[in-house]
Amino acid sequence: MELFNKEFSDAHNSLADARACGECYPYLKNHVNEFKSIGVNKVIIKASDVAGTTGCHPFRKPDEIINELWHKYFPESCKTQTREQVAMGVLTSMGSTEKILNDANGFKANTTAEVQKKLRGAYYDLERSGLSGPDTVAAKDYIKKTLYTNFGTQNEQRTADEDSAYLIRDDTFYSLDVCEIMGTKYQVVGRIDRLQVHENGSKTIVEIKNRMDGLFNVVRDYEEIQCQTYLQMVPNISFCRLVEQHDVYRKGYLIQKNTEKWKNDILPSLIKFCEFFHSTISKNVTNTRKHGLDSRAHKEIQTS
């Protein structure tokens, strides 16, 4: 919209999509990053978002992460609400929908069937709440994410306790420097689920995934990127064991540290994301601040 002064219509129509791509391609081809000092010493990217920054996560897109970082570090200049802000605005707009939100936040379950039952009930209530179509979709997505995330968090300890290996908690927030642009350091920060301690004293990172709809029976690309990120962040560890659990069923997958993949694939994509974010902020925030200073100076001249 801001680039072309119009909105593209008929999304997911193959002809309309092709035409839109034809208009976007020349801009993307000729796009040049613009780097300026943005007045922030450090920008932190969550380790779980690294796959999203590289475009490999089906549910976390780069533009969504950029929008969230923009809101976090430069809220005064960000014009677009995050998905969470939109959903929270919808769910708190009426007493009935706010009750659905509070129920979801406080809900505890021992099985995935209990979560699915609660979700169906929430969907039923939202569809009859009087919300518009788009608002209903936003509210449903947020309630689903809340119930699924809370279930995973609440049952992480149980999944760890049921593991046959000796697992310990590690509350350390590990960090990894990505790059530095015009005085701003970009850093990945995250905390691992558990550490497995072997008899010889060596350790393995354990990443726990509580599944809602059944076992995946495979490590998804975005999950491997998350594990590779942890293996780069945590020193002196060469393996990460991903444990997926769906109720009483579980599987484990051993992932070996792949420094070549990190250096040649993941890290370059992550750096490009940081560069694009920094360029976007350089073009928008610095102009906004300059406009604010110019307006303030103009007022001071008028009142002097």
What are these regions (language model features)?
Residues 158, 166-290:
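Nucleic-acid nuclease catalytic cores
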